[in-house]
Amino acid sequence: MNILYLILFFSISLGQAKDYLFEAGGIISNADEELIEYPDGTKFIVYKGNNGAWKDSEGDYGKEKCIGYVKTNINKNAEVHFRCEGANQNGEKFWTTRIRKSDSVKGGGGINTYVAGTGKYKKMIGIKCPYGVQYHEDAVWYTHKCKLNE
């Protein structure tokens, strides 16, 4: 009977996940965007940024670059799709997609998906994490939170 309790305990312990928090920020330059505006007020904007800095709950930190688009309509609803590449202080890399649809260009929430990785980030491939992003003037703040199996 004791063996059964031990097996049950370890099964539950192994199935538990821990929170992983990723925070990034940067400055957006108008030089980093291309814009097409339609007569009805719809906009299609392509952004590229090479100056993002980040840190995470594991004690890692680094830089990232992202390229993507924002499509808005006359109601200022936004459809956003970005692809990002980041590297930590040890040179380990990760690649993500960040997709959201929201009621505001100024911020909102979406899903970050890890699509490739080297080193410690290989184990994160396929993990989807909800994120939030907020803009103020030329500054951007971004956070995503994942559940990682230990």
Sequence positions of predicted segments:
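Sec-dependent N-terminal signal peptides
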Residues: 3-13
